[in-house]
Amino acid sequence: MEPTFHAFMFPWFAFGHMIPFLHLANKLAEKGHQITFLLPKKAQKQLEHHNLFPDSIVFHPLTIPHVNGLPAGAETTSDISISMDNLLSEALDLTRDQVEAAVRALRPDLIFFDFAHWIPEIAKEHMIKSVSYMIVSATTIAYTFAPGGVLGVPPPGYPSSKVLYRENDAHALATLSIFYKRLYHQITTGFKSCDIIALRTCNEIEGKFCDYISSQYHKKVLLTGPMLPEQDTSKPLEEQLSHFLSRFPPRSVVFCALGSQIVLEKDQFQELCLGMELTGLPFLIAVKPPRGSSTVEEGLPEGFQERVKGRGVVWGGWVQQPLILDHPSIGCFVNHCGPGTIWECLMTDCQMVLLPFLGDQVLFTRLMTEEFKVSVEVSREKTGWFSKESLSDAIKSVMDKDSDLGKLVRSNHAKLKETLGSHGLLTGYVDKFVEELQEYLI
């Protein structure tokens, strides 16, 4: 029997980071390893149902120190606007004493981290291994966080002429520029000083970008595969949504979801709704209420609900995205191109229309659209604005089975799904990852 290890996990205080770390923790626990998961106190309740091995994965809550400017009680990115991320990062750095005390008391064999660049210092002092585990795409890491990199400029030797920023991406780079200096320092410092770099991806999608990162940091890069979550079949799809979707033929409904951090301005939210209406297809929109509105209904265009009654639903609350994507009536998924969302969608038969908002989403969109040609990107103006016509045109182009573009993306998506779904591929990544970790610990 292979020896087991005890790992600490300390992800950035965002559910988009904590949940993928917990998916990895589940895979490690399944193989008999012990995990101590460090997280903000308030986040524990929301993560408990993702813990499939509560006897092996122990949550270790941290008290988040107060930082001037951070709202009282704010502990995760869900509690703040994107512009306050730097303040939450300060709070994360101030938990160092708590983390070090836990390391001293519990003596793990290794510690996984992402933004806490000081973890390798603690690890070396206590003779344990540190793993910089990145859940963002390897494409983004290669382009944005190469040593000596400059925001928005491809670094020397970058391995793609297609996966690039363009003039119309200034809106996404503007958001990234707010915290780029901090992020660049955190990630590059972590990469240079850690023992192991690990990425949530696979060679079939991002192999050349992983090789580039390895060459830039002179370290072997371990891959976990996409770490797809186990499907939660304990709760069926919300009855109201299930009833709505079941009224339509297979692969006829357009589903739109933009992730937990994207809040649209009211005029852009209305343009999104009008674009979905313009397709003439049945649709389900699941997004947060627009700025200045407490509900999605408040922000809808005048007369919209009456015009789309029976064929369109705008949902302002949380939805069971994996169950919706698995529903036979869903034919197209309009999304923000978060890597986790794309991995989910690639394993379905839904066609993809991509509407990226943040820098990492833009690059992953180009990978899917320009290199793999499995999706279509919604065109934008230089300001970042997208029109109802550009959204409608993108959706109709992938939903038209007879168009050249529709045939191309369907064919390429089917091939990629077959590759990723081939027997043993994804479990093989996890097995190899664990084996390589154990070799480092010998």
From Swiss-Prot:
Coiled coil feature spans: none
EC number, as in UniProt: 2.4.1.-
MF terms in GO: UDP-glucosyltransferase activity
Superkingdom in the source lineage: Eukaryota
Glycosyltransferase in keyword set: yes
Organism: Arabidopsis thaliana
Keywords: Glycosyltransferase, Transferase
Protein name, UniProt field: UDP-glycosyltransferase 79B8
